[in-house]
């Protein structure tokens, strides 16, 4: 999979591709089942679903921490210029 953040010598992302300013929420990547669909899953499928959703939530949370840290660095650097 290619890097989704364009480098200076690359073209910007095309329609449907991500760029560094796109935001992602848990709801964007979560899989939701209706009660009827959930009832059709066996216990191992339900456990797999829970594990995948928990991992997705952890991944998004870690990205948020990195984003906040990087945003803070940019603010500090900007303030140092004054």
Curated annotation (Swiss-Prot):
The superkingdom listed in its UniProt entry is: Eukaryota
Q: Enumerate the InterPro entries for this protein.
A: KRAB (IPR001909), KRAB_dom_sf (IPR036051), Krueppel_C2H2_ZnF (IPR050169)
- Extent of Polar residues compositional bias: 1-23
Give every KRAB domain span: 24-82
Which residue intervals make up region (Disordered)?
Answer: 1-25
Q: Name one GO cellular component term.
A: nucleus
CDD domains tied to this protein: KRAB_A-box
- Would you kindly state one Gene Ontology biological process term found in this protein's UniProt entry? regulation of DNA-templated transcription
Which protein are we looking at? Putative KRAB domain-containing protein ZNF788
**Species this chain originates from:** Homo sapiens
What is the name of the gene encoding this protein? ZNF788P
